[in-house]
Regions:
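Compositionally biased, low-complexity intrinsically disordered regions
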Residues: 1-2
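Helix-start/capping segments and mature chain N-termini
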Residues: 8-93, 97-101, 130-307
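Short, acidic/charged, Gly/Pro-enriched secondary-structure junctions
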Residues: 96-131, 146
């Protein structure tokens, strides 16, 4: 990496905060503890496999008042994803320290009802071409913070219109075909973004994937939560945590809170009719939090704000 890509701390403090909306720390072999870098100049090689092939992993987190929520859960999932891709194990204490340092120096976040909010991302790339088949060191890590967009905050209260879409292939047990990377959060998100464009062109906001057998899986970038009142009992469901579903940190946190509040918990299988007949459906993700699904395939769904 050229020295010009690294800016001195004194310069960063004086000018960088005033001109950039994102704050970035780079960790690599030369700087294992991380250094602040200027995101407006080149930081990676043109043959980096994260850039050319999506060969890497990432996590997206929410920071409120400069404290990252569920950081431990995200670091655990990042480690699991890296292991599936045969990337070196991330060092959680180094990453935790870098995240905390980043948030102390980050530019101003978005002011919301929760406080000052930032999106925080950790990205680990495979590195240059020669790192693809060898186990030689090569990966680098970027950690960045930026204000949460108003459009995301809006979804928390106004909800989303969703469409049911087939996954396109029958999900398998994660362990049977490890090269399919089921349950890993990889940089290969082209399909997810194509899905969002597809539904938005048709008047919806998001998608919920289903199998060929019409079992509910997950959202394009979220977990699915379904509430039902059964014989006077509140039950919260999510699809069974197999079949290539990414384990949701927000879903896990919501389930724990619901359990403590006296809810019963269930793990699928769920079908479209379960969603249509439910007392509430939500898409759960770390930054958007819990967005109510107001319409599914154009049909209005029940939604009780008290739930």
């Amino acid at each position: 990496m050229r020295a010009s890509t690294v800016i001195p701390r004194w310069f960063w403090m004086r000018t960088y905060n005033k001109t950039m909306s994102s704050t970035v720390i780079l960790l690599n072999e030369q700087n294992p503890q991380g250094i602040f870098v200027d995101p407006s100049v080149p930081l990676i090689s043109v043959d980096d496999q994260g850039f050319t092939r999506g060969d890497g992993v990432f996590e997206t987190m929410l920071s409120v008042n400069r404290r990252v929520r569920k950081l431990g859960m995200h670091l655990s999932r990042l480690e699991s994803s890296a292991r599936m891709l045969d990337l070196p194990d991330p060092e959680p204490e180094i990453l935790r320290s870098a995240v905390e340092r980043l948030m102390r120096e980050a530019t101003a976040g978005a002011e919301t009802a929760l406080g000052e909010e930032h999106i925080v991302k950790i990205i680990i790339s495979r590195g240059p071409t020669q790192a693809v088949t060898s186990m030689q060191p090569g990966p680098y890590t970027l950690i960045m913070a930026s204000p949460v967009p108003a459009s995301i905050v809006k979804r928390r209260t106004e909800g989303v219109k969703a469409m049911l879409l087939p996954r396109g292939h029958e999900p398998m047990d994660n362990s049977a075909y490890p090269w399919l990377l089921g349950g890993a959060k990889t940089l290969s998100y082209a399909v997810n973004m194509a899905v969002l464009r597809y539904v938005q062109e048709r008047g919806a906001d998001d998608a919920i994937f289903i199998t060929d057998e019409r079992r509910v899986l997950e959202g394009a970038t979220s977990s699915v939560l379904v509430a039902k009142i059964e014989d006077g009992k509140k039950v919260l469901y999510t699809p069974e945590p197999s079949h290539g579903i990414l384990p949701g940190t927000t879903q896990g946190a919501v389930f724990e809170a619901a359990r403590q509040a006296g809810w019963e918990l269930g793990f699928g299988p769920l079908y479209p009719q379960d969603l249509f007949e439910s007392d509430g459906v939500w898409l759960a993700s770390s930054v958007r939090l819990i967005a109510p699904v107001t319409h599914l395939n154009g049909t209005a769904l029940a939604h009780d704000p008290e739930l």
